[in-house]
Amino acid sequence: MQGSVIEFLKPHLVNIEQISSTHAKVTLEPLERGFGHTLGNALRRILLSSMPGCAVAEVEIDGVLHEYSSKEGVQEDILEVLLNLKGLAVKVSGKNDVTLTLNKSGIGPVLAADITHDGDVEIINPNHVICHLTDKDASINMRIYVQRGRGYVPASARVHSQDEDRPIGRLLVDARFSPVDRIAYNVEAARVEQRTDLDKLIIDMETNGTIDPEEAIRRAATILAEQLDAFVDLRDVRQPEIKEEKPEFDPILLRPVDDLELTVRSANCLKAETIHYIGDLVQRTEVELLKTPNLGKKSLTEIKDVLASRGLSLGMRLENWPPASIAED
């Protein structure tokens, strides 16, 4: 009897009511009191903000330099055209970004079905209206750049990350990557045998058609479970101590002596003695350097002062010098 008091009930999927191909209601019960709101709110937030999908991110329209303009023969202004393009439901297989083209002329509506694309792309809502052409000689030509992402990313958040040489006329669009259009949940009372203090979770959601509602909930639950994995066993959360690999030699020792900016006379004397790197130089003693032809006390003093300004001195001993990278050269 004690076990039944402390053990949690394990919920199960009771019903999936498929209202349409993009609209479904999912019922989950029984849940311990309070868990309906706990799980419902978590799943709702993930479904709205963290689901991956594809969306229109940029658009180029022939004859249009900026979004605050209009195009002759097009009923809508450019801002409205961009707003309509945001409603395009695109499904892309195997790629992170694709370019679609749209070329239409003559009087009538311009639909998503008029977009040209390859076999990796599927337009879910082909009857979606993009704009209307009002003249028989009117035409519209555009390149639509679709990217894969997550959640909602406004155009303003991507401006700083774009190249400065962005072509004039390439318009940024607020990208709504999430395939979930609407999500709501309701918690009702549930009963199991004599217990009446239980919850029933009902999730009501609509998608843009690029993902099945049931699959969307399954993915959201997977994301939530993966995020909670770190808490499953707190004894294992300690990270192994990572020992930083210190370089065998101070990087300054691997630099050429030319970096010391010595006088031409001193530099030539060192090169004549095959002293090419600072690591070669610091291992020489004052006596050894004074034996170098044409290198006098003035040059020696200059070398000592330059080394001292870098925290080095003559007569140093370096184990395993030269390193393999220099020896190979």
From Swiss-Prot:
GO terms for biological process: DNA-templated transcription. Keywords: DNA-directed RNA polymerase, Nucleotidyltransferase, Transcription, Transferase. Residues 1-235 are annotated as: Alpha N-terminal domain (alpha-NTD). Coiled coil: none annotated. The keyword Transcription applies. It is an enzyme of class 2 (transferase). One of its GO terms (molecular function) is protein dimerization activity. GO terms for cellular component: cytoplasm; DNA-directed RNA polymerase complex. It catalyses: RNA(n) + a ribonucleoside 5'-triphosphate = RNA(n+1) + diphosphate. Pfam families: RNA_pol_A_bac (PF01000), RNA_pol_A_CTD (PF03118), RNA_pol_L (PF01193). Residues 249-329 are annotated as: Alpha C-terminal domain (alpha-CTD). Its EC number is 2.7.7.6. DNA-dependent RNA polymerase catalyzes the transcription of DNA into RNA using the four ribonucleoside triphosphates as substrates. The N-terminal domain is essential for RNAP assembly and basal transcription, whereas the C-terminal domain is involved in interaction with transcriptional regulators and with upstream promoter elements. Homodimer. The RNAP catalytic core consists of 2 alpha, 1 beta, 1 beta' and 1 omega subunit. When a sigma factor is associated with the core the holoenzyme is formed, which can initiate transcription. Belongs to the RNA polymerase alpha chain family. NCBIfam families: PRK05182.1-2, PRK05182.2-5, rpoA. This is DNA-directed RNA polymerase subunit alpha.
